Amino acid sequence: VHGQALLVKGDRTSPSCKHCHGNHDAGLPQAIYVGNICSQCHSLTYELFRNSPHKAAHDSLGIPECEACHGNHKIMKTSDDMLGTGQDALCIQCHSPTSKGFKTAFAIKNSIEDLKKEILQAKESVSKVEQRGMDVEDALADIDEANNSLTKARGYIHTFSEEQVGSIVKEGETLVKKAKERALKARDDFNFRRKGYIFAILLIFIFTLTLYLRIRILEKPGKEN
């Protein structure tokens, strides 16, 4: 991702060779030094990691911090598949199925996926009423905030805490619930208006028909007012 940012997008702030290896006296960087380089841009994520149980485990085992999961030179775009207990998950490389870490990874992954599904369902509900011409600005704002909660929860994965990630996911779920309620109310308003329009059209039709028949009667020869 850093190479794409630098070479394709032209982002000169993206890390390059010199950031880890130096300029003139280039050498092999210490593992801890690379983590410090990452923290210059990913400061919040790094701070969450430093306060997590993984920090002490990495230090005691001599495992690199950021590189252990994200690599060094070939840093790929992150995805939710990296989390959890699936075949592509990184957690299972160290945590056995009976371990606490395995269960925590499973729970965090499920909470993230649940929020994603809830957001998708809310988008579909809001989209349907929006296509009917209803005002859904507030519902869309709720969905945007829920997406922000999802992004924040993904960052807080680095706490490796089911409770901390779960609390953020709950914030997102609350916003999604509000969006769904707004969409439901908009749908009910649309149905009420539609019934009102139908009733009004029916009244106009009856009035017009009555008036037409009255005129026809009056126009017949020999009929008086």
What are these regions (language model features)?
Residues 205-225:
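Juxtamembrane interface at the cytosolic side of transmembrane helices
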Residues 1-117, 121-124, 128-138, 152-163, ...:
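Inter-heme linker and motif-flanking segments adjacent to c-type heme-binding CXXCH motifs
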Residues 139-154, 196:
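Long, amphipathic, charge-rich alpha-helical segments that form helical bundles/coiled-coils
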Residues 117-120, 172, 198, 205, ...:
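Alpha-helix boundary/capping detector
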Residues 33, 146, 222-225:
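Long hydrophobic alpha-helices with heptad-repeat/coiled-coil character
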Residues 184-203:
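Juxtamembrane/start-of-transmembrane alpha-helix segments at the extracytoplasmic/lumenal side
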Residues 94, 143-150, 166-180:
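Amphipathic alpha-helical bundle/coiled-coil segments
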